[in-house]
């Protein structure tokens, strides 16, 4: 019994020792496992750090690659520009090496395709035409370029115009409207009927069977709005406005004035629809005398050319001529006959209502005091033209500026009336200071 108990105790001790040894072995294995786990975590962290470094390096390389691409594109563009410049310089060099061409004028086109050309050096040539030249552009009077050796026509040049004629083209479409003109309602209606309507609705005249006037004569005192009216018509008709003063056509050399008139109408045809406005037409259109001097005869030649040009276009063409003068009484009757300036529109000095409308137009952008009475100003400025009223408004504004004010008062206007109209009284002796 005792032996059995001792044996059991011995077995238990052995089992305990086995368990203890197993426990120690497992603890040793567990330590080894954690050690390996720590090693793996360390390697993982090192690998992750390496990956982050590689990612940063990759981003840096991608950025450098993008910069390289941009630089490459810029270099390609620079190379393209250089190639274009080199080609242009090469072309310029080739052109510089070519001998200059001679300018000539075509006088006649022959049946066999050749042309008779008068060169700028004087002699005439029967010349061949280069295949590169558009024969539709070849016509008598055309300017052409001639080869020095063969005298062949190698190019058709643009028609030559005097720089003074080109300077006459004021505006493709002036910015003046009928709202900018006061006191001329009847005159506006008349000029619209004879100028604007034929340009915008020519088919209406064809249906009715009447021809509109070719030219309109505006006459009246200076400063009454003749030029302004012509500009407004050009604007509303959407036409090119070509303005000149007739004294510009009075030239020193024989035939010079007539040539300017000819080129003026050529420009009008090119820019059609167009309105030619000739101011102070009495400078070339005065009544012709038998006992004229050489200077008078040159003026008469210019007038004759103007009459010929007006006879040379159809009333329904896209060209209208408006002339202005202060001296209708001295004009040559040939100018005023039907087919030329056959519509005469008088532009008088404005009446009181007209002056009031003009004052409203010129003061609409001004900063006026409450005491400004435009009706009174219209009443006291009898005999004033539209230009005088504009000068009065400008002078009143200048008086306010002179006193560092941003509001124009009635007193400013009265002083301006006194100054502007007083000066007119000195010149004409006609103005009466009605407000005193």
From Swiss-Prot:
BP GO annotations: proteasomal protein catabolic process; protein unfolding
Subcellular compartments: Cytoplasm
Coiled-coil stretches noted in the UniProt entry, renumbered to this chain: 7-98
Residue numbers spanned by region Docks into pockets in the proteasome alpha-ring to cause gate opening: 434-436
Cysteine disulfide partners in this protein: none
Keywords: ATP-binding, Chaperone, Coiled coil, Cytoplasm, Nucleotide-binding, Proteasome
Domain of life from the UniProt record: Archaea
CDD domains: RecA-like_PAN_like (cd19502)
Keyword Repeat in annotation: no
SMART domains for this protein: AAA (SM00382)
Quaternary data: Homohexamer. The hexameric complex has a two-ring architecture resembling a top hat that caps the 20S proteasome core at one or both ends. Upon ATP-binding, the C-terminus of PAN interacts with the alpha-rings of the proteasome core by binding to the intersubunit pockets.
Domain notes for this protein: Consists of three main regions, an N-terminal coiled-coil domain that may assist in substrate recognition, an interdomain involved in PAN hexamerization, and a C-terminal ATPase domain of the AAA type.
PANTHER family the UniProt entry points to: 26S PROTEASOME REGULATORY SUBUNIT (PTHR23073)
Family affiliation: Belongs to the AAA ATPase family.
Name recorded for this polypeptide: Proteasome-activating nucleotidase
Originating species: Methanopyrus kandleri (strain AV19 / DSM 6324 / JCM 9639 / NBRC 100938)
């Amino acid at each position: 019994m005792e032996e059995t108990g001792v044996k059991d105790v011995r077995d238990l001790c052995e089992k305990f020792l086995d368990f203890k040894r197993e426990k120690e072995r497992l603890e040793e294995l567990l330590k080894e496992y954690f050690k390996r786990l720590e090693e793996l975590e360390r390697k993982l962290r090192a690998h992750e750090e390496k990956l982050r470094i590689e990612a940063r390096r990759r981003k840096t390389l991608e950025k450098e690659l993008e910069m390289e691409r941009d630089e490459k594109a810029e270099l390609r563009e620079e190379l393209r520009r250089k190639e274009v410049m080199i080609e242009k310089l090469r072309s310029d060099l080739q052109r510089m090496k070519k001998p200059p061409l001679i300018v000539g004028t075509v006088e006649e086109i022959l049946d066999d395709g050749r042309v008779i050309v008068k060169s700028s050096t004087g002699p005439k040539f029967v010349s061949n035409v280069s295949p590169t030249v558009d024969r539709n552009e070849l016509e008598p009077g055309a300017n052409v370029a001639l080869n020095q050796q063969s005298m062949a026509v190698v190019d058709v040049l643009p028609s030559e115009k005097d720089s003074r004629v080109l300077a006459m083209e004021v505006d493709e479409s002036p910015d003046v409207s009928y709202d900018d003109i006061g006191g001329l309602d009847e005159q506006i209606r008349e000029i619209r009927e004879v100028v604007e309507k034929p340009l915008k609705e020519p088919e209406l005249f064809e249906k009715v069977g009447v021809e509109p006037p070719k030219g309109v004569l505006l006459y009246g005192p200076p400063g009454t709005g003749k030029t302004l009216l012509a500009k407004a018509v050009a604007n509303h008709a959407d036409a090119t406005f070509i303005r000149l003063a007739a004294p510009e056509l009075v030239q020193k050399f024989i035939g010079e004035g007539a040539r300017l008139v000819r080129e003026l109408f050529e420009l009008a045809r090119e820019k059609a629809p167009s309105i030619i406005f000739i101011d102070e037409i009495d400078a070339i259109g005065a009544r012709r005398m038998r006992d004229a001097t050489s200077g008078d005869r040159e003026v008469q030649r210019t007038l004759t050319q103007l009459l010929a040009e007006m006879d040379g276009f159809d009333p329904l063409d896209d060209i209208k001529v408006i002339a202005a003068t202060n001296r209708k009484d001295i004009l040559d009757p040939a100018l005023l006959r039907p087919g030329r300036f056959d519509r005469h529109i008088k532009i008088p000095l404005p009446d009181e209502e007209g002056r009031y409308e003009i004052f409203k137009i010129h003061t609409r952008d001004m900063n006026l005091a409450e005491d400004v009475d435009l009706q009174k100003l219209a009443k006291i400025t009898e005999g004033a033209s539209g230009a005088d009223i504009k000068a009065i408004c400008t002078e009143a504004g200048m008086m306010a500026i002179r006193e560092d004010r941003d509001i124009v008062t009635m007193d400013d206007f009265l002083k301006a009336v006194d100054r502007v109209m007083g000066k007119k009284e000195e010149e004409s002796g006609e103005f009466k200071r009605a407000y005193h």
